[in-house]
C-alpha cells in the first residue's frame, strides 16, 4: 500500500482550503480630498488629488499668490494676490533680525507695485475654476476665514494694517493699523478676535473681529510668521523665525506663557495644530524639516525631513497626512502622520508658498 508523505498531505490540505475559501486583502479606499497649492512666482494654483497624489489641475489666479485658505464647507478656495514684486531677503544682523534701510529695496518695490493686482482670488473648488477677485486692501499676504464663512481677516504687508472684508458685499468693513510687516493671521476658536503677527518688531496684535478695534497686544522675538490655536481655544502657538523658537500663549488672557527652543538650525514659519489637539506641527524653513511638538508640554517630539525651506503646511481632512510647500525645490512634501515620515513629493513648479486641503466633491 502506498503511503503519502505527511508534508505532501499537509500541502494538499492547505491548497484545498485556499481553493474553497479564497482570501483577498480588503480594498482600502483612498483619501477623498484635494490639495490646493499657491505658487508665488508662476501666479497659479496646483491641485493635487489626495487619493493618488497626481496633479489634477493648474489654475491661473493672478500675481504672486501666497496665503491660501478654504471656506468652512470646503467649497471655495481663497488666495491672497499681490502686485508688489518679490524682494530679495533682507540682510540680517548678528541675532538674525532683518536690517531695513530707508531708500532700499522696500521703497523700490513700492514704486513698482501693481496695486490693481492686489486682492483675494476666489476659486470654485469642485470645478477648479477661478471666479473673481475681491478687494482686500494693499498687498495682502495672508488671512483667515471666519467660522461662519462671512468675513476675511487679512494682513496688508506693505501698509502695516489688517483689513476685515465682508465676502458677500466684497467691501472692506474695517481697517486696523498694526506694526510693520504683518503676516500671520489666525481667528480665535470662539470667533471673537483674531491675531495678527508682525514680523519686524515681533508684535502680536489682538483685534476684535466685529469692530476691528485693537483689544491688546504683546511681543515675542522678531519675525513671528504665523499663529494657530488649539481646538479648545486655551492656547495659541506662534513661531519666531529669527530666534528659532516657539511661543506658547495663553489665548484667554492673550499673554505669553513661555518660549521653547526648536532644534538647531530651525527657522520656523507656519504652525498647525492637529485636529485632535494633541500635537503641533511647524515648518522649520531653512532647516528643511517639520518639527513635531507635544501640545500640552510644547516639548519637541520629532523632526521630519522634507524638501527645501518648507513654508506653508496643511493637514488633510482625515488628519492622516501633512502637506508642506517647499518653495526652492518646487515641490510639495507628503508626510504620513502615523509614522511621521515623508512618503512622497509632488512637483508644483513656480515656488509653492501656501497649501490647503479640502474634501473632494467631484
Summary of predicted features, one role per range:
Residues 1-12:
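Bacterial N-terminal signal peptides that target proteins for export
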Residues 10-21:
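Bacterial N-terminal signal peptides
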Residues 21-362:
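Predominantly soluble domains enriched in secretory-pathway, periplasmic, or organellar proteins
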Amino acid at each position: 500500500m502506498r503511503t503519502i508523505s505527511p508534508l505532501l498531505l499537509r500541502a494538499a490540505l492547505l491548497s484545498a482550503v485556499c481553493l474553497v475559501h479564497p482570501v483577498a486583502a480588503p480594498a482600502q479606499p483612498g483619501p477623498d480630498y484635494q490639495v490646493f497649492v499657491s505658487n508665488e512666482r508662476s501666479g497659479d494654483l496646483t491641485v493635487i488629488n489626495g487619493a493618488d497624489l497626481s496633479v489634477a489641475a493648474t489654475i491661473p489666479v493672478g500675481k504672486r499668490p501666497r496665503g491660501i485658505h478654504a471656506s468652512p464647507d470646503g467649497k471655495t478656495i481663497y488666495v491672497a494676490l499681490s502686485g508688489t514684486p518679490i524682494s530679495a531677503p533682507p540682510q540680517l544682523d548678528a541675532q538674525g533680525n532683518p536690517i531695513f534701510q530707508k531708500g532700499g529695496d522696500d521703497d523700490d518695490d513700492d514704486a513698482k507695485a501693481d496695486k490693481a493686482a492686489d486682492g483675494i482670488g476666489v476659486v470654485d473648488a469642485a470645478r477648479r475654476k477661478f471666479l473673481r477677485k475681491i478687494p482686500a486692501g494693499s498687498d495682502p499676504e495672508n488671512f483667515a476665514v471666519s467660522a461662519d464663512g462671512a468675513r476675511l481677516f487679512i494682513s496688508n504687508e506693505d501698509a502695516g494694517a489688517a483689513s476685515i472684508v465682508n465676502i458677500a458685499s466684497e467691501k472692506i468693513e474695517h481697517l486696523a493699523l498694526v506694526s510693520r510687516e504683518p503676516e500671520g493671521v489666525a481667528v480665535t476658536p470662539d470667533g471673537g478676535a483674531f491675531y495678527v503677527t508682525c514680523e519686524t518688531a515681533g508684535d502680536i496684535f489682538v483685534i476684535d473681529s466685529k469692530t476691528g478695534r485693537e483689544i491688546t497686544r504683546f511681543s515675542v522675538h522678531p519675525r513671528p510668521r504665523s499663529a494657530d490655536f488649539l481646538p479648545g481655544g486655551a492656547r495659541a502657538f506662534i513661531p519666531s523665525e529669527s530666534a528659532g523658537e516657539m511661543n506658547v500663549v495663553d489665548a484667554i488672557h492673550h499673554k505669553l506663557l513661555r518660549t521653547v527652543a526648536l532644534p538647531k538650525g530651525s527657522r520656523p514659519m507656519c504652525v498647525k495644530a492637529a485636529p485632535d489637539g494633541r500635537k503641533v506641527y511647524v515648518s522649520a524653513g531653512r532647516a528643511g524639516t517639520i518639527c513635531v511638538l507635544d501640545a500640552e508640554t510644547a516639548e519637541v517630539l520629532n523632526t521630519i525631513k522634507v524638501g527645501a525651506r518648507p513654508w506653508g503646511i496643511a493637514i488633510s481632512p482625515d488628519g492622516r497626512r501633512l502637506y508642506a510647500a517647499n518653495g526652492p525645490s518646487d515641490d510639495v512634501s507628503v508626510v504620513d502622520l502615523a509614522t511621521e515620515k515623508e512618503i512622497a513629493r509632488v512637483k508644483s513648479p513656480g515656488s509653492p508658498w501656501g497649501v490647503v486641503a479640502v474634501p473632494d466633491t467631484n
